Amino acid sequence: MMQKQNMIVVNQKEIAKNIYELVLQGDLVQQMNDPGQFVHIKVAEGITPLLRRPISICNVDQDKNEFTMLYRAEGQGTKTLAKRKQGELVDVLGPLGHGFPVEEAESGQTALLVGGGIGVPPLYELSQRLVAKGVRVIHILGFQTKDVVFYEEKFAELGDTYVATVDGTHGTKGFVTDVIDSYGIDFDILYSCGPLAMLRALEGRYKERKAYISLEERMGCGIGACFACVCHLQADPSGHSYKKVCSDGPVFPIGEVVL
């Protein structure tokens, strides 16, 4: 159930180049039950920036009432958020959207989790949930270069983990699909989050497989009211049918929406 709460900053640190790990504490964490959901953050106490920023939920610790977000500080809003200090309050709206269907993976099956860049974080909570129900997980994490690689060790604690960098400075040189080809990786179910180019490449290969993708999209309201994040449905060539990434997604079955 969506709620709004001023949450306490427990810790914030830069874990890779311009990539920040922010831990917040508050009762809102008890509502965070579906990996792949996101929160809408008011990055500053004043009216500037006006719009909230959508950030995915990376890790949930309901015993401590804490959750972790990872984000890239690149625009005015996220750079402002990166300045928030321990003990300060952050206005959080969430959890929002529909997450990854953990129930679609069965114990004993193999799940392939593919993340690209800042699409990697929501896969961490998902992986933990899958492992807890006896699913074997394989992770492929794609980044531009070594300086922006993060959470490789944390994913490796949960299952086989491969890293690809476009420039070859760490792991396999190339894209996540190059890792799949190089190691002959197969799976029963696929979960993915990342840039559209990566999602399109996966859809081209696995449209007939059991697979779910999470879209990264700019949002205004985060609750389906402003229609800033609509995406069209593949089943309607006329383009009249659509879904909203913030409220209907961000996770969709592969092949459902136009990428």
Swiss-Prot record:
Keywords for this protein: 2Fe-2S, Electron transport, FAD, Flavoprotein, Iron, Iron-sulfur, Metal-binding, Pyrimidine biosynthesis, Transport
Signal peptide: none
GO MF terms, alphabetically ordered: 2 iron, 2 sulfur cluster binding; electron transfer activity; flavin adenine dinucleotide binding; metal ion binding; oxidoreductase activity
GO biological process: 'de novo' UMP biosynthetic process
Residues binding FAD, per UniProt: R53, P54, I55, S56, L70, Y71, R72, G77, T78
Domain called FAD-binding FR-type: residue spans: 2-102
Free-text comment on the cofactor: Binds 1 [2Fe-2S] cluster per subunit. Binds 1 FAD per subunit.
Pathway: Pyrimidine metabolism; UMP biosynthesis via de novo pathway; orotate from (S)-dihydroorotate (NAD(+) route): step 1/1
InterPro entries noted in UniProt: Cbr1-like_FAD-bd_dom (IPR008333), Cyt_c3_hydrogenase_gsu (IPR012165), Dihydroorotate_DH_ele_sf (IPR037117), Dihydroorotate_DH_Fe-S-bd (IPR019480), Dihydroorotate_DHASE_ETsu (IPR023455), FAD-bd_FR_type (IPR017927), FNR_nucleotide-bd (IPR039261), OxRdtase_FAD/NAD-bd (IPR001433)
Cofactor: [2Fe-2S] cluster; FAD
Residues engaged in binding [2Fe-2S] cluster: C221, C226, C229, C246
NCBIfam families, A to Z: PRK00054.1-2, PRK00054.1-4
UniProt xrefs under PANTHER family: DIHYDROOROTATE DEHYDROGENASE B (NAD(+)), ELECTRON TRANSFER SUBUNIT, DIHYDROOROTATE DEHYDROGENASE B (NAD(+)), ELECTRON TRANSFER SUBUNIT-RELATED
Cited function: Responsible for channeling the electrons from the oxidation of dihydroorotate from the FMN redox center in the PyrD type B subunit to the ultimate electron acceptor NAD(+).
Family affiliation: Belongs to the PyrK family.
Oligomer and partners: Heterotetramer of 2 PyrK and 2 PyrD type B subunits.
Name under which the protein is recorded: Dihydroorotate dehydrogenase B (NAD(+)), electron transfer subunit
Species in which this protein is naturally found: Bacillus mycoides (strain KBAB4) (Bacillus weihenstephanensis)
Lineage per the UniProt record: Bacteria, Bacillati, Bacillota, Bacilli, Bacillales
